[in-house]
């Protein structure tokens, strides 16, 4: 069994989550290729039993390359077991960590031609020292308005790694379902 994990990241946390998922899956005997969606050519879909795509939010939007990829390959994505994870800082609040309660994930899923079998909303990381001055200022303003961390000397990882491990187990279950057909 082999899994394709594609990610769209801006500051690296979505890639970290993709790598963690691959490690968890490997521990379950499932091999995974982790690929940056921004650098990916068309996947060899037939080489994989399922696909997972992760995408991060910046200033309220997913990267356009992610949106275009999903539109271009929706038929392929819908034709195999698939999962989606959204990474954003709103999800640092536990009540905003489901596709139903997270507005970014909900809007994407409602408008997307892709219908993943399983979805997760995962909190990202706040990495002020790594941001350009403009991003640091804007993100600080957003965090102040939403009651988040505003100390620009800090890096805070909000990702709940046990939630990511649970997501990996759900992904493994998707593979088992598809092989039972």
From Swiss-Prot:
The keyword Ribonucleoprotein does not apply. It is an enzyme of class 1 (oxidoreductase). Its cofactor is FMN. Pathway: Porphyrin-containing compound metabolism; protoporphyrin-IX biosynthesis; protoporphyrin-IX from protoporphyrinogen-IX: step 1/1. Residues 3-172 form the Flavodoxin-like domain. FMN binds at residues 9-13, 84-152. SUPFAM superfamilies: Flavoproteins. Binds 1 FMN non-covalently per subunit. Belongs to the HemG family. This is Protoporphyrinogen IX dehydrogenase [quinone]. The lineage of its organism: Bacteria, Pseudomonadati, Pseudomonadota, Gammaproteobacteria, Enterobacterales. The gene is hemG.
């Amino acid at each position: 069994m082999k899994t394709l994990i594609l990610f769209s990241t801006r500051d690296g946390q979505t890639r970290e989550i993709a790598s963690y998922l691959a490690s968890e899956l490997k521990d379950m005997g499932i091999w995974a290729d982790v690929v940056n969606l921004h650098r990916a050519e068309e996947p060899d879909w037939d080489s994989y039993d399922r696909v997972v795509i992760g995408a991060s939010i910046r200033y309220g939007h997913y990267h356009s390359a992610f949106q275009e990829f999903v539109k271009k390959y929706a038929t392929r994505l819908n034709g195999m077991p698939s999962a989606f994870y959204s990474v954003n800082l709103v999800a640092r609040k536990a009540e905003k960590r489901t596709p139903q309660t997270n507005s970014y994930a909900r809007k994407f899923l409602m408008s997307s031609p892709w219908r993943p079998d399983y979805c997760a909303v995962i909190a990202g990381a706040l990495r002020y020292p790594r941001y350009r001055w403009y991003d640091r200022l804007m993100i600080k303003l957003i965090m102040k308005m939403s009651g988040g961390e505003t100390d620009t000397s800090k890096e805070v990882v909000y990702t709940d790694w046990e939630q990511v491990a649970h997501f990996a187990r759900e992904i493994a279950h998707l593979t088992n379902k598809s092989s039972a057909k």
